[in-house]
């Protein structure tokens, strides 16, 4: 569970109490870092008057719902029980950062197509929209342009177009961020090329 001997030593030395487990200790360390960045940016703004928005782009699955996974969350998303969770596997309590106002915006990496059955784009996008509304956090959706044409579930050239249209249903979604910039360049594969045409046609309307 602990990949490096040094980290185990640090855990035993720096945990806040004898009953604090490794997972909570790691999450706490990440929380401190995020909070400190937030506080430093606030100090800078008060001195210079120049505001910088601080955001995070987390893995799309924060926590799976308890109806699907025992160690999940009662407000979690509905996806495959074995899917990686940002909270438990990456030790990142994004919801806490949003709720505490430590981040100005969030860009969940919803790098899944509509076609995928175990983890779907529409379910996760709707879930993040609700969470952003609850916490009053600016929301952009991270979309996997780089995946277009990469495997059997990414063969629909209108996937990005359909995702953009789906996003428009939610007032809470302020925009989209494609990963990656280099994938906006044509000539990589026919599916992606056709997809870029549909995106351009949609955006210039």
Regions inferred by a protein language model and the residue ranges of each:
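P-loop/Walker A phosphate-binding loop and immediately adjacent motor/lid segment at beta-alpha junctions
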Residues: 26-59, 117-149, 193, 198-205
């Amino acid at each position: 569970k602990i990949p490096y001997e040094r980290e185990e030593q640090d855990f035993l030395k720096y945990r806040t109490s004898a009953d604090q487990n490794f997972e909570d200790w790691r999450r706490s360390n990440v929380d401190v870092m995020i909070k400190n960045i937030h506080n430093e940016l606030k100090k800078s703004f008060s001195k210079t008057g120049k505001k910088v928005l601080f955001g995070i782009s987390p893995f799309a699955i924060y926590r799976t719902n308890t109806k699907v996974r025992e160690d999940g969350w009662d407000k979690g998303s509905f996806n495959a029980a074995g899917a990686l969770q940002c909270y438990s596997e990456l030790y990142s309590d994004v919801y806490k950062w949003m709720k505490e106002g430590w981040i100005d915006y969030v860009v969940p990496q919803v790098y899944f197509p509509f076609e995928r059955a175990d983890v779907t784009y529409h379910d996760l996008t709707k879930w993040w929209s609700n969470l952003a509304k609850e916490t009053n956090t600016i929301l952009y959706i991270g979309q996997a342009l780089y995946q277009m044409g990469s495997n059997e579930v990414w063969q629909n050239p209108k996937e990005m177009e359909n995702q953009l249209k789906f996003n428009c249903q939610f007032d809470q979604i302020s925009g989209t961020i494609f990963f990656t910039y280099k994938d906006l360049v044509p000539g990589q594969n026919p599916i992606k090329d056709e997809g870029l045409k549909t995106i351009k046609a949609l955006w210039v309307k």
